[in-house]
């Protein structure tokens, strides 16, 4: 298929710039994936679509405050560093601006010197392998010095950094939030659990590639960025049991889907304890083996994520739903409203 086939017109004012005061006060569009029927509801109505014996699968990753501002020791030049992926030990793959100022062997100091880095290797497109030195615990130092790397379409400063984290996130490692999970509160999850729905966690660390435009014309030529995932033995067994008993597996977010489908596609539809790196690209024509339904936000035109949701329903129904969302003034992208495809 052509990437252009996944385009739609989106007025800029519908791109949500800030989160709502109450996480659960967002709207929820409910789409029947087979018939294309649409219902306009509120997010708390999601409870009525989840039944006893179903699984609600959430991604428990946490976003790192991964944007750092430092000084090049040799010249005093201001340097911006974005952490992308942890390598061996204290070495990280990073994106550096301006990259031309940081060559192999250059050193950078952040804050009052609590964090330092040396460039080990130069990569293309401004990428650098930096090795960090610090006292104490790296993630605690990062919490003090780092900023949340908000998506490029969000122009406003975030007043409360916790609003770009899910309430249940605990595994540090993402460069972006698994945004479908931002709608849940502990109270809402407790009500869902009380109904007999099993709440199960997976981990996928979201990379910045999630915002990267698709730069090919034909979707079959697109290569996905790689992201780290992990599924525990307990979670795998619980999901397999639910599926065997006829329960639905409802994924919260495209990251949860990508984790489950990566594993299921390798093991004849079964889930097993596994961790590794996935480059799975789900687009129309893909046969889902693990997931029955999806809670997700509204995605960018021509993105791999709108291709994924089109695979779960079909392209025509998804684009019709997106046009309805525009007409009804739904809020789009990371801080926007939600969609339930079932």
UniProtKB/Swiss-Prot annotation:
InterPro entries according to UniProt = QueA, QueA_dom1, QueA_dom2, QueA_sf
An example Gene Ontology CC term for this record: cytoplasm
Q: Which UniProt keywords apply?
A: Cytoplasm, Queuosine biosynthesis, S-adenosyl-L-methionine, Transferase
Q: Where in the cell is it found?
A: Cytoplasm
Q: Which reaction does it catalyse?
A: 7-aminomethyl-7-carbaguanosine(34) in tRNA + S-adenosyl-L-methionine = epoxyqueuosine(34) in tRNA + adenine + L-methionine + 2 H(+)
State the Gene3D superfamilies in the record.
Answer: QueA-like
Keyword presence, Cytoplasm: yes
Q: In which pathway does it act?
A: tRNA modification; tRNA-queuosine biosynthesis
Q: What is its EC number?
A: 2.4.99.17
Q: One matching Pfam family, short form?
A: Queuosine_synth
Among the GO molecular function terms of this UniProt record, one is: S-adenosylmethionine:tRNA ribosyltransferase-isomerase activity
Q: Which GO BP terms sit in this record?
A: queuosine biosynthetic process; tRNA wobble guanine modification
What enzyme category does the UniProt record give? transferase
Family statement: Belongs to the QueA family.
How it assembles, according to the record, is: Monomer.
Q: What does this protein do?
A: Transfers and isomerizes the ribose moiety from AdoMet to the 7-aminomethyl group of 7-deazaguanine (preQ1-tRNA) to give epoxyqueuosine (oQ-tRNA).
Q: Show the NCBIfam families listed in the entry.
A: PRK00147.1, queA
Which PANTHER family does its entry note? S-ADENOSYLMETHIONINE:TRNA RIBOSYLTRANSFERASE-ISOMERASE
Name of the featured protein? S-adenosylmethionine:tRNA ribosyltransferase-isomerase
Species: Listeria monocytogenes serotype 4b (strain F2365)
Q: Taxonomy-wise, where does this protein's organism fall, top ranks first?
A: Bacteria, Bacillati, Bacillota, Bacilli, Bacillales
């Amino acid at each position: 298929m052509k990437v252009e086939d996944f385009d739609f017109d989106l007025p800029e004012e519908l791109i949500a710039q800030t989160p709502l005061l109450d996480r659960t006060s967002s709207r929820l569009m409910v789409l029947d994936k087979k018939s294309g029927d649409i219902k306009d509801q509120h997010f708390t109505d999601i409870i009525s679509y989840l039944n006893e014996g179903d699984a609600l699968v959430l991604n428990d990753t946490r976003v790192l405050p991964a944007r750092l501002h430092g000084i090049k020791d040799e010249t005093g030049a201001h340097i911006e560093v974005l952490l992308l992926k942890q390598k061996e030990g204290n070495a990280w793959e990073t994106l550096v601006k301006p990259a031309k100022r940081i060559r192999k062997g250059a050193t950078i100091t952040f804050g009052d010197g609590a964090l330092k880095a040396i460039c080990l290797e130069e990569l293309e497109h401004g990428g650098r392998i930096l090795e960090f030195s610090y006292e104490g615990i790296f993630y605690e130092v990062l919490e003090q010095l780092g900023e949340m790397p908000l998506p490029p379409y969000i122009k406003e400063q975030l007043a409360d950094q916790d609003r770009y984290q899910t309430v249940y996130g605990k595994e540090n490692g993402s460069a972006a939030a698994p945004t479908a999970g931002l709608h849940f509160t502990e109270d809402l999850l407790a009500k869902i659990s009380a109904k007999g729905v099993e709440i199960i966690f997976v981990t996928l660390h979201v990379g910045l590639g999630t915002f990267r435009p698709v730069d090919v014309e034909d979707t079959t030529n697109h290569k996905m960025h790689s992201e780290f995932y992990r599924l525990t033995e307990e979670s795998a067994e619980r999901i397999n049991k639910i599926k065997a008993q006829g329960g639905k597996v409802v994924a919260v977010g495209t990251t949860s889907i990508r984790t489950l489908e990566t594993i299921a596609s390798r093991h004849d539809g079964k889930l097993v304890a596994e961790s590794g790196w996935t480059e799975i690209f789900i687009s129309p024509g893909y046969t889902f083996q693990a997931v029955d339904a999806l809670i997700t936000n509204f995605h960018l035109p021509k993105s791999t994520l709108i291709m994924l949701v089109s695979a779960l329903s079909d392209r025509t129904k998804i684009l019709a739903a997106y046009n309805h969302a525009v007409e009804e003034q739904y809020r789009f992208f990371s801080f926007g409203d939600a969609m339930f495809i079932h």
